[in-house]
Amino acid sequence: MQQTIQTTLLIIGGGPGGYVAAIRAGQLGIPTVLVEGQALGGTCLNIGCIPSKALIHVAEQFHQASRFTEPSPLGISVASPRLDIGQSVAWKDGIVDRLTTGVAALLKKHGVKVVHGWAKVLDGKQVEVDGQRIQCEHLLLATGSSSVELPMLPLGGPVISSTEALAPKALPQHLVVVGGGYIGLELGIAYRKLGAQVSVVEARERILPTYDSELTAPVAESLKKLGIALHLGHSVEGYENGCLLANDGKGGQLRLEADRVLVAVGRRPRTKGFNLECLDLKMNGAAIAIDERCQTSMHNVWAIGDVAGEPMLAHRAMAQGEMVAEIIAGKARRFEPAAIAAVCFTDPEVVVVGKTPEQASQQGLDCIVAQFPFAANGRAMSLESKSGFVRVVARRDNHLILGWQAVGVAVSELSTAFAQSLEMGACLEDVAGTIHAHPTLGEAVQEAALRALGHALHI
């Protein structure tokens, strides 16, 4: 029997939430052990956020190169480009390797002991990993989430999840994406730009159903221009003889020949396989219930990130992980962000931060809503990307900004400014009175605020 490891903080899960909590705990001098059954970095770093953005970049570069085989207003002409998808995947893997190696180095630098293996929780103070017992004062659950599977579309062979989609050995002729949310559309657009025929099957009547139709309209238009077929209001029935079967709810059946089917219908908290049942924690649906300090219903047992429910975002998990480490160190902290940015890396990109016009209305708030189109922004024109807009939502009485939304090229990079303005309690006058560099996409942020005040300059 191996000697029991004693520690103050034991973290299960080395994803963004878990490793950030460990790094901060190490900085604060808290003895910390991190247990991870797979590669450090979790879903985000290995099979999610980072590799998907790398593949999206490859797809965009190939798509742009392919455009220039025909006459271009930019005056650029090239021969037909060729794609080595194996080399593309290797480049993507190299980025992942560098980042995961960096995480390991940071953990070592701050004195965090990393134990590789799957944790089995014995009680709120003890965990076992491959026969090694670890005893702790604080247990932090950061086990993440997993892809939702459909019983009529079991994974295997031509039916894949986002994990397999991010490491293709060859491109399919026809990829059918089941799910019109952000994961399905991000990958579907990437595959289309890489040269595959792509169809999207969505049970609801529109794409990106968690966003309002005004925001998603430019994305729908882009999908049409790219030649991606949308089959909305269709429920999947199965896959047989090389065809995806779906019905439209009116008695009609859809048959789509497909050599690859990507199931992208969401994610669920990962609570199985760790013996968490022994803790008898209070649940919030499929997620572990937490309070404003990320504490569960059991004293000194904490939960952060996807396992604690929506919004399932890496930056939320990171912020929670940092906070929990500081609470354990004795600092007074609460997780009460003014807003958490949600970003969809489609073409064009979509960003939502804070309250939308509909949410403000539902809460009985009297608001000013104003938007500024990228068609009137010089930088957007120079990027050949005039579609989309920036929209601001602010209280009518005191002009306090409650929310920002944007759709357009590279608007993901505006998300920080949006979140910061809400966190700092900015009013329309604060943003409108800030000199924005010219020419930048950020000028549309200032112009939206100016328009809300009744005097936009460039429209």
UniProtKB/Swiss-Prot annotation:
| Root EC class | oxidoreductase
The protein's required cofactor(s) are namely: FAD
Q: Where does FAD bind?
A: 36-44, 53, 119, 142, 182, 306, 314
What terms describe the molecular function in GO for this protein? Answer: dihydrolipoyl dehydrogenase (NADH) activity; flavin adenine dinucleotide binding
Instruction: Tell me where on the tree of life, at the top rank, the source sits.
Output: Bacteria
Cellular compartment(s): Cytoplasm
Cysteines paired by S-S bonds:
C44-C49
Q: Quick one: where is this thing mainly located?
A: cytoplasm
Sorted keywords for this record are: Cytoplasm, Disulfide bond, FAD, Flavoprotein, NAD, Oxidoreductase, Redox-active center
Q: Which residues form the active site?
A: H438
UniProt record similarity statement = Belongs to the class-I pyridine nucleotide-disulfide oxidoreductase family.
This chain's function reads: The branched-chain alpha-keto dehydrogenase complex catalyzes the overall conversion of alpha-keto acids to acyl-CoA and CO(2). It contains multiple copies of 3 enzymatic components: branched-chain alpha-keto acid decarboxylase (E1), lipoamide acyltransferase (E2) and lipoamide dehydrogenase (E3).
Further information in the entry reads: The active site is a redox-active disulfide bond.
Designated name of the protein:
Dihydrolipoyl dehydrogenase
Native species? Pseudomonas putida (Arthrobacter siderocapsulatus)
